[in-house]
């Protein structure tokens, strides 16, 4: 959930709720799923992060991006622990997908509709990758760019 606010503006409770929803909820779900997967010695844990997780982002996105980065690192830690098991762990980094949750927001660059986004998510998940950027075009090259571009330029793109 991306309902964060700017840091240092008296919005701690809203930012905490964003962090709890995005990270603590994912942690609880991972705990439950991995327990089941360990018991059956198989499974595929799919963790949904965000393209926003790739860099620190300004303003209302700071807490959202940080919580999604935490989710991605949680998945990587779980994957590291399960490397020599039949349990797979995938981290999915969706770009902008228009859904009910954000239907009132302004249209964003490279945004796809819900149907296109869902098809891309399913296609990525079925391949059981370690990481996937969804939809792959343009988010795979955008992800690479986000990691190497100067922060000032990333801020303008966000």
Q: Residue ranges of each PLM-predicted region?
A:
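Short, flexible catalytic-loop segment of classical short-chain dehydrogenase/reductase
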Residues: 94-104
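Alpha-helical segment proximal to the catalytic Tyr-Lys
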Residues: 35, 80-84
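Residue(s) in the substrate-gating loop at a strand-loop-helix junction
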Residues: 50
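Active-site helix of classical SDR
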Residues: 30, 67
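Active-site loop-to-helix junction immediately N-terminal to the catalytic Tyr of the SDR YXXXK motif
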Residues: 57-63, 77
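C-terminal helical subdomain
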Residues: 91, 106-143
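Conserved mid-core segment of classical short-chain dehydrogenase/reductases
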Residues: 1-16, 60
């Amino acid at each position: 959930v991306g309902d964060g606010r700017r840091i240092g503006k008296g919005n701690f409770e809203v930012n905490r709720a964003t962090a709890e929803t995005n990270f603590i909820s994912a942690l609880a779900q991972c705990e439950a799923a991995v327990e089941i997967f360990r018991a059956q010695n198989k499974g595929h844990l799919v963790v949904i992060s965000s393209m926003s997780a790739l860099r620190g982002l300004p303003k209302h996105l700071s807490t959202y991006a940080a919580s999604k980065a935490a989710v991605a690192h949680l998945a990587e830690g779980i994957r590291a622990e399960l490397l020599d098991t039949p349990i797979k762990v995938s981290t999915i980094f969706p770009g902008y997908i228009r859904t009910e949750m954000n239907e009132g927001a302004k249209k964003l660059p490279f945004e796809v509709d819900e149907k296109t986004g869902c098809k891309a998510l399913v296609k990525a998940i079925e391949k059981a990758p370690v990481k996937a950027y969804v939809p792959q075009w343009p988010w795979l090259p955008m992800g690479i760019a986000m990691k190497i571009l100067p922060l000032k330029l990333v801020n303008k793109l966000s």
